[in-house]
């Protein structure tokens, strides 16, 4: 809705619902006539199943979502401002068809909201400064609200993102530079963990809902493009971040105690702690340097070399691996070796034929055929060796793809 030449508003609603069935199905009897499955509690002596029947597990879930938002932008003089606010609610249900009760488990609706705002100030035709700030709540996913055994988390916390960003830009005919700094605090990340407590109706395996899992993501970035010549462009970019966990986490498991008549006579609580404070967030390089040179020797031909260097890449790991049991393990997760790789790109716009615009392109990735660790898992359960000390021999590594290429032809008509 256009309020005035300077102010424009937009409002919207979002309603979604989904019903999902989860099951494992018999697809091949391997020459047999039937199979006996013992997963269904309604058939404790086993159930004869044939092609198309469900085995192992069978449950159904529903997800109901409703949201509304209002956003607007305001442009006046040298200022460009915007803001938005939204609210949503989500509800989950769960039914286990292999349980005797087959009860519909329904969790209370979860409400979230978000608010964002920001603006840009144009100092002149070439320079501008900008700032953004936001607070966003994210509801926990169904698995973190209702566990596979039907356990409902009591008052699950919404995940919260508090972020701000500020920076500046400079743009001229030959030089473009963007500098920005960011700070994002991720609060109350929702995680669950299966543990052997010796408690619970499910046997020795129970669900622990972790609280206090917080992350801090801070850093700065620089991007630039410089026209060295009408046929040569230089691209440079640097990104440096410090992403780590803030504080430790804990989780409680509470189990009701019953007498022979089924009456509640007490409660047993088991507390679990997780040493996370100061550990680096894994599975993503926190520092990168990019340099690129683009050459356009003739009209329609574009050749680019792009070299990327990655550093401070910590291996992937899960907070539940730092459960406090005896000596507290606060050793940093394994950091993979730094690495760089060169990619080459070429494109040529062919002459138009019969009204068809055609572009030939080719890409050579990892042109120097470097060997590097692209991903890793810290203290791998299955592929690590020796004592678990967060070292290279404890990690499971995935090497980057060797030199490879592709060639393509795009046609527009």
Question: Residues of each region from the PLM?
Answer:
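Transmembrane beta-barrel strands of outer-membrane/channel proteins
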Residues: 11-17, 83-89, 129-135, 168, ...
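Residues on the lipid-exposed face of transmembrane beta-strands in outer-membrane beta-barrel proteins
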Residues: 1-5, 11, 68-74, 117-121, ...
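Surface-exposed extracellular loop regions of Gram-negative outer-membrane beta-barrel proteins
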Residues: 91-93, 121-165, 176, 181-212, ...
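Repeated loop/turn-to-beta-strand initiation elements of outer-membrane beta-barrel proteins
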Residues: 7-9, 78-81, 126-129, 174-177, ...
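Signature of Gram-negative outer-membrane beta-barrel scaffolds
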Residues: 8-124, 146, 237, 250
């Amino acid at each position: 809705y256009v309020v005035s030449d300077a102010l424009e508003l937009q409002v919207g609603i979002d309603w979604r619902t989904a019903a999902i069935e989860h099951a494992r199905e018999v697809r091949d009897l391997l020459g047999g006539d039937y199979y006996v499955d013992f997963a269904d509690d309604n058939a404790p002596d086993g159930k004869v199943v044939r092609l198309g029947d469900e085995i192992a597990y069978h449950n159904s879930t529903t997800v109901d979502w409703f949201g509304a938002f209002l956003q607007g932008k305001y442009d006046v003089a040298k200022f460009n401002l915007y803001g938005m606010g939204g609210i949503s609610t989500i509800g989950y249900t769960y039914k286990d068809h292999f349980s005797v009760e087959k009860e519909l488990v329904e969790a209370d609706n979860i409400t979230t909201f978000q608010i964002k705002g920001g603006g840009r100030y144009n100092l002149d035709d070439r320079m501008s400064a900008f700032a953004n700030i936001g607070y966003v709540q994210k509801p926990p996913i169904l698995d973190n609200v209702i566990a596979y055994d039907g356990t409902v988390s009591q008052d699950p916390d919404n995940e919260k993102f508090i972020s701000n960003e500020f920076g500046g830009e400079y743009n001229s005919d030959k030089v473009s530079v963007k500098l920005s700094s960011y700070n994002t605090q991720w609060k109350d990340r929702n995680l669950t963990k299966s543990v052997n407590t010796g408690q619970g109706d499910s046997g020795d395996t129970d669900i622990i809902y972790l609280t206090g899992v917080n992350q801090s993501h801070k850093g700065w970035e620089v991007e630039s493009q410089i026209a060295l010549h009408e046929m040569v462009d230089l691209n440079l970019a640097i990104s440096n971040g410090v992403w780590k966990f803030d504080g430790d986490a804990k989780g409680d498991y509470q189990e009701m105690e019953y007498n022979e008549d089924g009456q509640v006579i007490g409660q047993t609580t088991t507390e679990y702690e997780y040493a996370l404070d100061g550990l680096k967030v894994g599975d993503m390089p926190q520092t990168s340097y990019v340099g690129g040179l683009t050459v356009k020797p003739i009209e329609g031909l574009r050749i680019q070399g792009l070299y990327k260097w990655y550093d401070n890449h910590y291996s992937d790991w899960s907070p539940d691996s730092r459960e406090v049991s005896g000596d507290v393990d606060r050793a940093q997760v394994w950091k993979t070796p730094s690495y760089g790789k060169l990619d080459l790109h070429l494109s040529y716009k062919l002459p138009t034929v019969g009204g068809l615009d055609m572009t030939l392109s080719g890409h050579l990735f990892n042109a120097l055929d470097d060997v590097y660790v692209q991903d890793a898992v810290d203290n791998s359960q299955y592929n690590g060796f020796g004592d678990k000390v967060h070292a290279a021999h404890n990690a499971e590594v995935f090497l980057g793809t060797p030199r490879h290429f592709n060639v393509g032809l795009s046609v527009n008509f």
